C-alpha cells in the first residue's frame, strides 16, 4: 500500500469527560506522511490511529519475544522497554499476527500505574488487509482509600481530575487505496 484515504468515526466513553462523536478523514502516504481533516474539533493520537512499527522500535528496545496461540491463530508477543528514562510508557507488549505481521493488541504500562490496551481488527479492502476497528481502553489502579484520609497537619491538596478509565472506539470505513495522493495534501497549513 503506497497511500490511502479513510474515514474515521470516533466515539469516546471516558470517565469525567464529555466527548462528542467525531468524524475525521485521514490521509496516509508512504513512508510516514499523515494528514487529518475534520469539520469540527478532533483530537486523535496519531501513533494509535496509524500504527508505525519502525517508529515504535526507534523509541523502544525489544527485550523478549515469545509465541502464543490466540483465537485467530498464532501470535508473536514482543516485550518492549523504553529507550529513554523520561518516557511516559515504561513497558509495552505488542502482539503481532504470525501470518501477516499486523499488530492485534498493544498493552502499555504507564509510569503512574495506569494501563492502556489497544485492540486492532482488520478487514480486506481492495485485496489489502486494513484496519477496520481500533478499541482503546485505559484504566488506573483503584484509588488507595488510605491516601484519601485527611492528615490534620497537612494542607489539603486537590484530587486529580484525570480520568481513571475509559474507552475510545475508532471505526475505519470508505477506504481509497493507492489513489496517487499528492504530496500537497501533507503540507502544513
Model regions: which residues?
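Extracellular/periplasmic catalytic domains that process cell-envelope and extracellular macromolecules
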Residues: 54-55, 69-72, 87
